[in-house]
Amino acid sequence: MATTAAAAAAADSTPLQVCGCKGIRTCLICERQRHGSPPWQRSPQKKHCFLYCPDTGWAMGPKDSDLEGWAFPFPGVTLIKDFVTPEEEAEMVRLMDSDPWKLSQSGRRKQDYGPKVNFRKQKLKMAGFQGLPSFSQKVVRRMGLYPGLEDFRPVEQCNLDYSPERGSAIDPHLDDAWLWGERLVSLSLLSATVVSMSREAPGSLLLSSAPALGPDALKGSIVAPSRSVPCQEVEVAISVPCRSLLVLTGAARHQWTHAIHRRHIQARRVCATFRELSSEFLPGGKQQELGQELLQAALSFQGRPV
């Protein structure tokens, strides 16, 4: 545990007065320089907050709130606790810190292992991409031991470094679906956080009585929803422990945006997100040859940040 604490307390080599924010994105550094309030203080907050329950797969109303006892199914989330050991965590962060971090938006720093991509024009090039880092080989192999990840072959890894001193956060967003495939897989290191899910869809979300016996408790019976809330006012909080693996698929991947609010970064957090190819780049797809080239490079595990 001492090694993990030492990694978490490692000095940030990036001067605090420098940030990588552009456009509407801000962090504590540029907010202080501009003497302005951050965008989230000017934006309306979600009125109906639910907590994701990994045991049931439902989004549950918090205790001691007007939503207590109400819930709705929230499919597409898998949370694997203690995916790596504290010793593996400390070694991974040590190796990440041995390479330079680049400034990114909203107080983050990043390291990219993947092709150079222009998502707007749907173009990509290898541009020096030589594969995922060597220290991820064991992690990727271990992923294949879990149900739903047996055939997961990542072609891109993005490391993000969050710091409370920089006011790090990431705005609600959906990951691209032209290049990246069905599963988004993220490994959280150094500290816990909360991933906040929201959906900017019209209409209402129907609520039922919270299940007591797991996701199959309501099978065989018809439960009429007895309450509804506007979908755009709902936020689902997924508690993500340190050293856990979070997998988003289906509706959680394609319909609900994911974000990390500034208030949920209480200590340094490093996240490694792994992405697979979409069907367009797999056998039978119109860009299968390029996809094969990307996979061969990625799974050589000889890469450095690009």
Language-model segment annotations:
Residues 1-306:
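Non-heme Fe(II) oxygenase metal-center motifs and adjacent flexible, charged/small-residue loops
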